[in-house]
Amino acid sequence: MNPEYDYLFKLLLIGDSGVGKSCLLLRFSDDSYVESYISTIGVDFKIRTVEQDGKTIKLQIWDTAGQERFRTITSSYYRGAHGIIIVYDVTDEESFNNVKQWLSEIDRYASDNVNKLLVGNKSDLTENRAIPYETAKAFADEIGIPFMETSAKDATNVEQAFMAMSASIKERMASQPAGNNARPPTVQIRGQPVAQKNGCCST
């Protein structure tokens, strides 16, 4: 067990290109926002350590490229994820319609019990809204996953989204048999014995 934290959770941000995944990550990890962004190439990640219920939780958050040409690269990152956040743009109907495709990617590549959260980003752009809150909420309820709208620009619900995901993973871990949690991280992320060497360079 690492004395610096009680749990390490690997989170994955997925969704169409341009929906604001990188902006959400930047807002949560660094509390900053940039108006112009450069599309993520392959994958990027940031780490933030949080306190929840008296436990120290290290969140390793992976930001994936939304473009089709990177799909093969990013699909390999699903396997070790404890939680996956599916992001769409509330002003972009196509990005919402494609959520089903992203969910099928999760079914194909991620572990069966992975925690999921649907996030509608750019909620600050009220005049350009294409997807009503009620529509997305009904869809999320139908498939049985939590839903939240966020704005990386004005920081609305960004902290809450990541903390809610962390709490749901922690709750799931607590209900599992002892030893089957996120400590140490090499077990969860790589599926290899702790003593295994050179297994964490790509995580």
From Swiss-Prot:
Q: Which organism is it from?
A: Arabidopsis thaliana
Q: Which domain of life is it from?
A: Eukaryota
Record gene name: RABD2A
Q: Where does GTP bind?
A: 15-23, 33-40, 63-67, 121-124, 151-153
> GO terms for biological process?
endoplasmic reticulum to Golgi vesicle-mediated transport; protein transport
Compartments annotated for it: namely: Golgi apparatus, trans-Golgi network membrane; Golgi apparatus membrane
What taxonomic lineage is listed for the species of origin? Eukaryota, Viridiplantae, Streptophyta, Embryophyta, Tracheophyta
Q: Kindly indicate whether the keyword Transferase belongs to this entry.
A: no
Protein name in UniProt: Ras-related protein RABD2a
What are the UniProt keywords, alphabetically?
Answer: ER-Golgi transport, Golgi apparatus, GTP-binding, Lipoprotein, Membrane, Nucleotide-binding, Prenylation, Protein transport, Transport
Family of this protein: Belongs to the small GTPase superfamily. Rab family.
Q: Name one GO molecular function term.
A: GTP binding
**SMART domains in the record, alphabetically?**
ARF (SM00177), RAB (SM00175), RAN (SM00176), RAS (SM00173), RHO (SM00174)
Q: List the disulfide bonds.
A: none
